[in-house]
């Protein structure tokens, strides 16, 4: 469904999910993915979205783990942090807990794991924070580094940007029980581009951006 010439302004990310979750009296365990390119604001959005709207208090963040392992050079322990994060995800899934994690979606390996979780009764909810270009992603990461945050090599950012969008289109949107695609070009004015899910009719609020992201013909 296209809602022409309208882009819904999000004062905060809680409003993105209210229509999806407010009517669910009894909810199954859920895995929530906060996705988007490097520098898109995933970690910044996590607190209000997860603790506020979704009531999910288990957020596995490999970047935070890396900082805990090596505060001044987290990039040096990225592999080890990733291994610890994956182990924690498996632990939470085995405990049938609801949990969340962030990713650029540049890896395809989450898809079969998510399918397996869904087969056991889990629901998969996806929130993708979109940026219009890899160049903006690079600029956001550079800004983060100037503020004391962790760096990501430029070539890695570009690879993840394209790979994440490709996998979003072909793997993760078709798999999600619910998905929200959010324009985070302006951090003070996030806008909902489109939403939908397995049993939720897709609604497109910004047709031009939707066609651009999904590579649809005009």
Where are these regions (language model features)?
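A glycine- and Lys/Arg-enriched "phosphate-lid" helix/loop adjacent to the NTP-binding pocket
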Residues: 122-170
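Phosphate-binding P-loop
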Residues: 23-28
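Glycine-rich phosphate-binding loop used to anchor ATP phosphates in small-molecule kinases
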Residues: 77-131, 164
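Conserved lysine of the Walker
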Residues: 42
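N-terminal pre-Walker A segment at the start of P-loop NTPase domains
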Residues: 8-16
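P-loop (Walker A) phosphate-binding loop of NTP-binding proteins
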Residues: 37
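Conserved substrate/cofactor phosphate-moiety recognition/catalytic segment
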Residues: 46-97
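NTP-dependent small-molecule kinase module
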Residues: 170-218
């Amino acid at each position: 469904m296209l809602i022409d010439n309208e882009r819904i302004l999000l004062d905060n990310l809680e409003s993105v999910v209210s229509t999806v979750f407010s009517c669910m009296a009894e909810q199954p365990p859920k895995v929530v993915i906060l996705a988007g390119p490097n520098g898109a604001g995933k970690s910044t959005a996590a607190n209000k979205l997860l603790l506020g709207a979704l009531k999910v208090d288990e957020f596995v963040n490999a970047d935070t783990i890396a900082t805990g392992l090596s505060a001044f050079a987290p990039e040096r322990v990225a592999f080890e942090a990733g291994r610890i994060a994956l182990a924690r995800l498996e632990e939470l899934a085995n405990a049938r807990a609801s949990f969340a994690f962030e990713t650029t979606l540049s890896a395809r390996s989450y898809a079969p794991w998510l399918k397996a979780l869904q087969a056991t009764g889990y629901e998969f909810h996806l929130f993708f924070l979109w940026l219009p270009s890899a160049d903006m992603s690079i600029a956001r990461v550079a800004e983060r580094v100037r503020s004391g945050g962790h760096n990501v090599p430029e070539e890695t950012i570009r690879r993840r940007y394209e790979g994440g969008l490709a996998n979003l289109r072909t793997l993760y949107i078709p798999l999600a029980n619910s998905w929200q695609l959010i324009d985070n070009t302006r951090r003070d004015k996030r806008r909902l581009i489109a939403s939908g899910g397995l049993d939720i009719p897709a609604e497109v609020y910004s047709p031009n951006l939707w066609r651009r992201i999904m590579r649809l013909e005009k």
